[in-house]
Amino acid sequence: MKTLDIAFQLYDHYDQIEEIKAYYGLMAFYRLAQAAYEAKDPERLQQCREVLAKYPDHVDHPHYSYTCYRYGGNAQAWAMYKGIIQNPEHRLAEFAELMMAQDKDEQGVLCLAGGSEMGQIWIDSVTAISPYMLFAGLVCQNQKYIDFAADQCIGHCEALWDESVNLINQCRGFRGVKGLKSEDHWSRGNGWAYVGLADLLEYLPKESPKWERVKKIFCDLSEAIIKYQADSGLWRQEITVDSAWVESSGTALILYGLGIGLRTGILQGEKYEKAFKKGVEGLLRDCINEDFSTEHSCIGCMCPGKDEKKGTIEAYLTEKYAKHDEHHSFGAFMLALVEAHRNGYTEVCWETRTLK
């Protein structure tokens, strides 16, 4: 079976079980666009155009943390950058300006609405902010947007970096004390950071003075993160705890970053190549069922716990759980598979779930 066909089947299954919307749905649109572009599939490319044409005016929008979601987020911006959508009257700049006007902390890092006083930031935001602003900047030829994309990624990663393990905490400012971070090293949270870093490394102009800093953070995170890969090829809900349950959506996001690092030559060596192949095969084997339903993806997770346990590793492990067909899984899995295809693994032996 073609690797990209598995990605399309995942999307179709997702589309059958629920309406694809909210930020995790927009991630699936982004991955559908990438898979269609790689496959050069006219029908899938048209599907992308039709889905994204509904944004912003013909969608029953849920609550969003970031205004770019109202315009289709990264999927819209990337599709325009790649020429999948050609619309001279596009509104990328309009929504980029709205993004830049959102609440910020004292260092200029975007906060959740109303959260600037406590400095409330989430690493999840990196995947929402940086790719959209980068592609909007490239399409609009606006250096301000490109710089903002890099600055937000760097700012979030530096603010939430745990130097003791070179991994990333999910959030800051949600435990009742300004500046106090969560204690976790959550798989999907580190994956969100990794996606933003990886997209910047691939598309940020190399002459940017910010490119080397992005590369340094990416390489440090890469070196740390592969140490914790389980024998199954997956990473765990709490990356640093060997007894924690495996978590598939974070694994898939991490694999996307590893794939870009390998393909661009930023990551070199057998250890990264082995980790990537082992991870994709683990995802195929343990997390994708025969009907393309999914397993082992953590439900929504926003600094879990109460009182003194809020934001602790214990809370991330005991108050959250993995769910069958969890909606964060689909776009993340598609990401990993698209990157496997780009790295030369264009076929999968479906019976054994091994890459060819």
Regions found by a protein language model. Name each.
Residues 21-28, 68-72, 120-123, 127-130, ...:
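Start-of-helix signal in alpha-solenoid helical-repeat scaffolds, especially tetratricopeptide repeats
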Residues 2-43, 50-77, 81-91, 246, ...:
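CBM-like carbohydrate-recognition segments
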Residues 43-50, 55-175, 180-183, 290, ...:
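Extended ligand-binding groove/face enriched in aromatic
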Residues 123-124, 136-237, 244-255, 267-314, ...:
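Extended ligand-binding clefts on enzyme/binding-domain cores
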Residues 132, 196, 221, 329-332, ...:
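Hydrophobic alpha-helical segments typical of transmembrane helices
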Residues 14-18, 57-61, 112-118, 176-182, ...:
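A short, mixed-charge helix-start or loop-turn motif at secondary-structure junctions
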